[in-house]
């Protein structure tokens, strides 16, 4: 079962890079920090290489909801501290998965983790969700869809199999993030 393969970070580390909500470290960096005025090429190169490396190490039990939430959990402060800014920043949680979510805890618990990290900003108003996901998750109200709709605005999504829509979905998600930044901050 899934629980045989799942150890939440609150019960100790499984020592796997990028597991349990910890950032995937690539090239000595757990995430790439940049400014909108910087040359985008280094970010693109780092992200492309990190995504390929992470994809090759993944498991068939995909738990993106747990991963997105445990990023904000205090148990992951040693690797993730400083990644989520509470004040003056909108958080875009973007899912890129070709499998339905298999995270074991209830959606309400995962939602609370992210809300706790964005209290000063305004909670729901400062968290947006988007993603390239399997088309089935909405229709069956799968856990991933429940999580993506648990925050303020409707998620921006596209079918992971429709590669032609990738740019449009990412562009809309980034535009919504910038729009919300102007509205709420």
Please give the residue ranges for each predicted region.
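Divalent cation-coordinating acidic motifs and surrounding scaffolds
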Residues: 1-185
């Amino acid at each position: 079962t899934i629980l045989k393969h799942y150890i939440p970070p609150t019960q100790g580390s499984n020592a796997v890079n990028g597991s349990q909500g910890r950032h995937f470290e690539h090239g000595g960096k757990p995430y790439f920090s940049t400014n909108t005025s910087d040359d985008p090429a280094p970010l693109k190169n780092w992200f492309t290489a990190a995504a390929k490396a992470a994809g090759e190490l993944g498991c068939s039990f995909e738990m993106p909801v747990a991963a997105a939430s445990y990023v904000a959990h205090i148990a992951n402060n040693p690797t993730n501290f400083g990644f989520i800014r509470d004040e003056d920043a909108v958080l875009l949680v973007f899912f890129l998965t070709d499998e339905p979510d298999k995270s074991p805890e209830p959606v309400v618990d995962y939602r609370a983790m992210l809300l706790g990290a964005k209290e000063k900003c305004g909670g729901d108003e400062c968290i947006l969700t988007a993603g390239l996901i399997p088309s089935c998750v909405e229709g069956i109200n799968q856990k991933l869809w429940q999580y993506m709709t648990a925050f303020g605005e409707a998620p921006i999504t596209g079918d992971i199999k429709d590669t032609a829509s990738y740019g449009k979905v990412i562009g809309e998600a980034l535009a919504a993030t910038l729009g919300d930044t102007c509205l709420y901050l």
